[in-house]
């Protein structure tokens, strides 16, 4: 056997999974990603928007629109319409994000929050449609709440039973049930609306009790649910069982935990929270139902929960930021008279950077400067 020496080039960079990273460093990476995301948005906007190319000084107004999206200048706190719309959107997104979190901690990938919330809205509005004028308004609101919660729980518990008993793929199951929920709403609208428009107008029932502002109760409910769910997941026996099942089903079984029961019970909790969100939309906001009543927030909630590492309190900050982006991007489209797709592009770019930052939090990238090739002995 002869021995030859071959030149081996060092790789330009090396990836290694981090064993740990300090919280300040992780947040520094995230903040850097957000800053780069906003910078990239400015570059893309400059390229795509003719007004910015003609008047580069307008780039300052472009960034100012993010603040204008959540605050009306010269308005008091109570009368600040943009602020309360922002808080309303934040609260609904937070509620739906909370709904998917217990299942996610159990590694039950519930992608069906959109459909579970939509079915809850349908159940709530169905009660109002058939009982409006027949029962007192206070009783109608109570029955609407019960209908919303029960409807959402039923829609959530179906895939849970199939997973617990037959070990079906919950991701596909819950995803497909979103489409079934959409068609179910369209079916009832055809039955209820006789003129063929398939559009049900707002029903005339008493609004939810309000003080300080019409949306204040909705915001308060979202905050209360965040604290309650945090305590439930962190400091209760059921929360502990959810974590154990999420870590290892086999370990949970050896520990005497009834895994099937935990799966079904956890999805009942998720359905209940979707039902609360559905009730807030049906009784507190829209007073009607369409196939787009949830507006895709069930899917956005998945990202909120994941970015918050399934922590209900951190989720409030993530919901705040994503809603801030959405409102700001919408304000940009309105102020500069752009297509709504531009606002979605802007939001998507920033979220792409944020999601990408998680890679650098989990992995360390080491770059190697170009050096002379080193020799390596290889037996042949």
Q: Each predicted region: which residue ranges?
A:
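Membrane-interfacial amphipathic/re-entrant helices at transmembrane-helix boundaries
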Residues: 4-95
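Hydrophobic core segments of alpha-helical transmembrane domains in multi-pass membrane transport
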Residues: 30-46, 94-100, 121-127, 148-152, ...
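Single transmembrane alpha-helix segments in multi-pass membrane proteins
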Residues: 50, 70-131, 145, 149-168, ...
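Transmembrane helix-bundle core of multi-pass membrane transporters
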Residues: 170, 174-235, 288
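Loop-to-transmembrane alpha-helix initiation sites
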Residues: 170-172, 214-221, 263, 293-297, ...
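Helix-loop-helix "hairpin" substructures at the membrane interface of multi-pass membrane proteins
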Residues: 211-288, 312-313
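Transmembrane alpha-helical segments in multi-pass inner-membrane proteins
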Residues: 268, 274, 280, 284-348
């Amino acid at each position: 056997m002869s021995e030859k020496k071959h030149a081996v080039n060092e790789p330009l960079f090396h990836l290694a999974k981090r064993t740990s990273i300090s919280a300040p460093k992780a947040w520094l990476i995230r903040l850097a990603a957000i800053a780069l995301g906003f910078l990239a948005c400015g570059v893309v906007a400059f390229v795509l928007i003719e007004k910015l190319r003609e008047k580069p000084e307008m780039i300052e107004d472009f960034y100012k629109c993010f603040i204008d999206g959540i605050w009306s200048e010269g308005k008091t706190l109570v009368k600040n319409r943009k602020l309360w719309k922002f808080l309303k959107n934040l609260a609904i997104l937070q509620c739906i994000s909370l709904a998917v979190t217990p299942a996610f901690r159990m590694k039950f990938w519930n992608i069906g929050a959109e459909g579970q919330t939509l079915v809850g809205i349908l159940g709530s509005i169905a009660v109002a449609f058939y009982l409006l004028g027949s029962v007192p308004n206070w009783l109608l609101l109570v029955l609407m709440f019960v209908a919303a919660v029960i409807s959402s729980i039923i829609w959530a518990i179906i895939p849970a039973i199939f997973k617990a008993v037959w070990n079906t793929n919950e991701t596909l199951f819950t995803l497909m049930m979103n489409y079934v929920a959409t068609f179910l709403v369209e079916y009832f609208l055809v039955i209820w609306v006789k003129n063929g428009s398939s559009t049900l107008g707002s029903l005339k029932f008493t609004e939810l009790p309000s003080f300080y502002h019409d949306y204040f109760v909705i915001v308060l409910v979202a905050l209360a649910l965040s604290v309650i769910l945090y305590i439930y997941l962190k400091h209760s026996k059921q929360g502990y069982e959810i974590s154990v099942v999420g870590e290892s089903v086999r370990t949970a079984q050896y520990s005497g935990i009834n895994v099937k029961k935990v799966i079904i019970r956890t999805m009942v909790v998720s359905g209940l929270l979707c039902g609360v969100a559905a009730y807030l939309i049906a009784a507190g906001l829209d007073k009607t139902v369409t196939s787009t009543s949830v507006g895709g927030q069930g899917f956005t909630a998945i990202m909120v929960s994941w970015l918050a590492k399934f922590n209900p309190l951190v989720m409030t900050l993530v919901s705040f930021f994503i809603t801030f982006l959405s409102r700001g991007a919408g304000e940009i489209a309105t102020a500069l008279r752009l297509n709504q797709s531009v606002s979605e592009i802007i939001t998507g770019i920033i979220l792409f950077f944020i999601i990408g930052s998680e890679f650098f939090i989990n992995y360390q990238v080491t770059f190697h400067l170009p050096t002379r090739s080193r020799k390596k002995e290889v037996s042949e």
